[in-house]
Amino acid sequence: MNKCRLLKKKKLNKLRNELDSLDNTLLKIIKKRTAIVKQVLKLKDYKYQIVDKKRIKIILNRIKKKSIKNKIDPKITNHIWKNMIKSYIDYERRNFKKK
């Protein structure tokens, strides 16, 4: 392997390690977010309260604005947030207990 290729491989491994570290941080944040969602779910009396379309729209608009302000592709963040919201809606539906 030539020197240039070796340096690229080393740099690639370093960047992948940084991504792995960020993934670990994201997992901690997701754990914290899930704990809050559990608390929110306990406050909901009816299953229809799980999906709040107005709030979802507000969240997605806020994330879009912040993404643009921070020079992040809003298509990426929109996709991430929509999937996260869908996942938590599914989680709430599976864990909803009638009172």
Where are these regions (language model features)?
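Domain-level signature for soluble enzymes in the chorismate/prephenate branch of the shikimate pathway
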Residues: 1-99
